[in-house]
């Protein structure tokens, strides 16, 4: 069975048992009345069952309801069908004030019907020939308004300075100021020029997201013809069907696939209603993607540390034990489905490097947009500053130093021999994003 954990907030006067049963019925075989065609099938075989209810500590009138769905209710290899069944209709139920899908347990038999990420973590490292450290990226800013040539120039400067990747922002598709084909050509030129100068393999996340699946595939094919290593997709706005099709194409044609989670906070930010990002992350691993944005813990976007590390493990590891202290409701066995690299992006700069290296480890991408392009000396020095900071943190960690305790000292020591890093540290020494997280663990 597929197991689901729902956070249920019943209307006043509705007992939790009735609410849990209603969720199970509405998201499987139930309807609002008895129908004569019920007698033509075995409802006991196909109906969802609410098998456990527990109150949420500190939250009156909120309950975690566990529902089991028989596997025959779902089409093989279809995240679209899985979500249509489990969350398609039930969230508008009048008997509930609010409903949130907290976690899913995907059984091994169902996991094996998915291809998952096009390549996975180890294959990506082998393709890039980069080991033993996090990868570095940069989102090109301003996200909208640059011409294709100026955009490509910014990519080249960042890659030449020491970054591994540059990135299209999620809303860069094919607008009047920069059509997609022009952008692809200038970015490919930036990749090849910077590779020739640095001797390192470089990439730019070319956003193939489009208004139709046919147009999306046309852009992916053009990227492959240019010989670039990686493309990008906005998987929630583009849809799971489009994403799975693109992931299959990338696997067959040797392209890495970077996934942006644009629109996720509409779905996952409210604590009592919606779908938790750990579910969206599991769905992405099944649908297919080699990278996905996962929050930063320390930057400008929502992300509490234990919760973030919980779904980072769900993205990368092969077997994850149940651990309610990190928000993981079920043990998940991925049976060797390739892993996804988490991407930390949003309001981060060189002072965050020790914390990011310590939190995310080597199998991650650390992406500095404003933290590269905002350098007072220009884009290439901004990239140099980030690369120096990363190398200093990795070396210190490998020497046994504690990044959580000595992080600022390590960065200051590196500033003595890197004027680019010293200038970056001076610019961003006062910038902090200190707000309470909306989504927190139940105590």
UniProtKB/Swiss-Prot annotation:
GO terms for molecular function: magnesium ion binding; monooxygenase activity; ribulose-bisphosphate carboxylase activity. It catalyses: 2 (2R)-3-phosphoglycerate + 2 H(+) = D-ribulose 1,5-bisphosphate + CO2 + H2O; D-ribulose 1,5-bisphosphate + O2 = 2-phosphoglycolate + (2R)-3-phosphoglycerate + 2 H(+). It is found in: Plastid, Chloroplast. The disulfide bond which can form in the large chain dimeric partners within the hexadecamer appears to be associated with oxidative stress and protein turnover. Keywords: Calvin cycle, Carbon dioxide fixation, Chloroplast, Disulfide bond, Lyase, Magnesium, Metal-binding, Monooxygenase, Oxidoreductase, Photorespiration, Photosynthesis, Plastid. The keyword Plastid applies. Its EC number is 4.1.1.39. Binds 1 Mg(2+) ion per subunit. The keyword Electron transport does not apply. The modification N6-carboxylysine is found at residue 167. Substrate binds at residues 89, 139, 143, 261, 293, 345. Its cofactor is Mg(2+). Mg(2+) binds at residues 167, 169-170. It holds the Pfam family RuBisCO_large_N. RuBisCO catalyzes two reactions: the carboxylation of D-ribulose 1,5-bisphosphate, the primary event in carbon dioxide fixation, as well as the oxidative fragmentation of the pentose substrate in the photorespiration process. Both reactions occur simultaneously and in competition at the same active site. Heterohexadecamer of 8 large chains and 8 small chains; disulfide-linked. The disulfide link is formed within the large subunit homodimers. Belongs to the RuBisCO large chain family. Type I subfamily. This is Ribulose bisphosphate carboxylase large chain. It comes from Callitriche heterophylla. The gene is rbcL.
């Amino acid at each position: 069975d597929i197991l689901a954990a729902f956070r249920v907030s019943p209307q006043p006067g509705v007992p939790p048992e009735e609410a849990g049963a209603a969720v199970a019925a509405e998201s499987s075989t139930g309807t609002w009345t008895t129908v004569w065609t019920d007698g033509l099938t075995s409802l006991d075989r196909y109906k969802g069952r609410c098998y456990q209810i527990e109150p949420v500590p500190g939250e009156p009138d909120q309950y975690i309801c566990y529902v089991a769905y028989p596997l025959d209710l779902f089409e093989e290899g279809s995240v679209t069908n899985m979500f249509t069944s489990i969350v398609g209709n039930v969230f508008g139920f009048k008997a509930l004030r609010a409903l949130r899908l907290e976690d899913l347990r995907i059984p091994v038999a169902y996991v094996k019907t998915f291809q998952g990420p096009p390549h996975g973590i180890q294959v990506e490292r082998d393709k890039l020939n980069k080991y033993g450290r996090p990868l570095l990226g940069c989102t090109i800013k301003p996200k909208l308004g640059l011409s294709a040539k100026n955009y490509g120039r910014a990519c080249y400067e960042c890659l030449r300075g020491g970054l591994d990747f540059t990135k299209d922002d999620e809303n860069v598709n094919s607008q009047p100021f920069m059509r997609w084909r022009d952008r692809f050509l200038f970015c490919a030129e930036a990749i090849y020029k910077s590779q020739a100068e640095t001797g390192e393999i470089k990439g730019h996340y070319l956003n193939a997201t489009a208004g139709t699946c046919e147009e999306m595939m046309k852009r992916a094919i053009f990227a492959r013809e240019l010989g670039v290593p990686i493309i990008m997709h906005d998987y929630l706005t583009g849809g799971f069907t489009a994403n799975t099709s693109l992931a299959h194409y990338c696997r067959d044609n040797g392209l890495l696939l970077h996934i942006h989670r644009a629109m996720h906070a509409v779905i996952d930010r409210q604590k009592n209603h919606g779908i938790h990002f750990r579910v969206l992350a599991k769905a992405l691993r099944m649908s297919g993607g080699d990278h996905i944005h996962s929050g930063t813990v320390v930057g400008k976007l929502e992300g509490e540390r234990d919760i973030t590390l919980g779904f980072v493990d769900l993205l990368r590891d092969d077997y994850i034990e149940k651990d309610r202290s990190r928000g993981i409701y079920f043990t998940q066995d991925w049976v060797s489905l390739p892993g996804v690299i988490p991407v930390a992006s949003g309001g981060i700069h060189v002072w965050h490097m020790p914390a990011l290296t310590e939190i995310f480890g080597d199998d991650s991408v650390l992406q500095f947009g404003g933290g590269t392009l905002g350098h007072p000396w220009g884009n290439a020095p901004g990239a140099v500053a980030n690369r120096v900071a990363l190398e200093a943190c990795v070396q210190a960690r490998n020497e046994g130093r504690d990044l959580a305790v000595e992080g600022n000292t390590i960065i200051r020591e590196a500033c003595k021999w890197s004027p680019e890093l010293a200038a970056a540290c001076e610019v961003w020494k006062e910038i902090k994003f200190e707000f309470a997280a909306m989504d927190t663990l139940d105590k």
